[in-house]
Amino acid sequence: MAIEQTAITRATFDEVILPIYAPAEFIPVKGQGSRIWDQQGKEYVDFAGGIAVTALGHCHPALVNALKTQGETLWHISNVFTNEPALRLGRKLIEATFAERVVFMNSGTEANETAFKLARHYACVRHSPFKTKIIAFHNAFHGRSLFTVSVGGQPKYSDGFGPKPSDIIHVPFNDLHAVKAVMDDHTCAVVVEPIQGEGGVTAATPEFLQGLRELCDQHQALLVFDEVQCGMGRTGDLFAYMHYGVTPDILTSAKALGGGFPISAMLTTAEIASAFHPGSHGSTYGGNPLACAVAGAAFDIINTPEVLEGIQAKRQRFVDHLQKIDQQYDVFSDIRGMGLLIGAELKPQYKGQARDFLYAGAEAGVMVLNAGPDVMRFAPSLVVEDADIDEGMQRFAHAVAKVVGA
């Protein structure tokens, strides 16, 4: 006897899913390029990008083809074996970056967990078992595991789960003097996002990152760049460290790496990687053929002059629209970020209302993000069309007008 199929609605979420999210009332069902449609057929311009994930838009033909081809070849074998798509992708990443070794995981959290474990272990086996201090920054975000959420340091994410990993120090972002005050030879790593995404789309200053590099060298500590959100072309360079001219010891990547397919990577040097051995870390799904095939196709498109050199012009188009909205409605105190990771900070009279602007945007037919309660965030496709930018920002202007009561 056939099981009766009931309608899938937003109410279904509340009935079956753990209450760790508060999703929108509409359910997207189809995407193409920078447009999305919901169950009722309503169209949205997507400037959220799945939180900086769909770097080539939705259902890009090259990614679809890679998925279909690999899906008919080999899905999963575990890391008891290696596979061709993983080795090809690893070679591409190494040839394009400072790195000499890479390991694949499934999410930004897992890549960062790997990085932090490696940093601690490297210090332990190469220097001292007492060299365990990790220095991180206020308003950081590095993931949701107990280790990564502790390095992130935001109490709203880390409190209420019992004892946390210890010897993690947090200091103000972009404050080199604060780092110097806590840095010593017991420090194993400094962990930093070149652009704080969840923390308000705040970019590090060149002097800050250069100073961190010098301090790490002075104290034999590793410099870890979390480029989960700002990497893979988002800034206009393949990775943000290239823009700054500051090379980390370890770099993490995820989100746009797979163009929408779950995959992450941790990149490092051969010498640092040699601290690990078989069994030091692992993942059942990490580096699976499906994910690596799609990521390889995404990499081949993103790492081209056509894409990377077009990002600044697209950014300026967004900024022009935001400035026009601000001139008309007087809502933003700052427009910041880098490349196509854009933050618009709300003026004091609208502090705490970022979600109101987000919801009004969805009602007007445009998907945007917030970065905390006071900042609107835009993380669109790196190949978003000018017409989509113009249409989406016009819709966002209508949303702003509604919130401010104009």
From Swiss-Prot:
GO CC entries: cytoplasm
Note: The reaction catalyzed by ACOAT is highly reversible. This enzyme may also transaminate ornithine.
One GO molecular-function entry: identical protein binding
Phylogenetic placement of the source organism: Bacteria, Pseudomonadati, Pseudomonadota, Gammaproteobacteria, Enterobacterales
Protein name (record): Acetylornithine/succinyldiaminopimelate aminotransferase
Record organism: Escherichia coli O157:H7
Residues bound to N(2)-acetyl-L-ornithine: 144, 283
Database matches in CDD domains: OAT_like (cd00610)
EC number per UniProt: 2.6.1.11, 2.6.1.17
Primary gene name: argD
Class in the EC hierarchy, top level: transferase
Co-factor binding comment: Binds 1 pyridoxal phosphate per subunit.
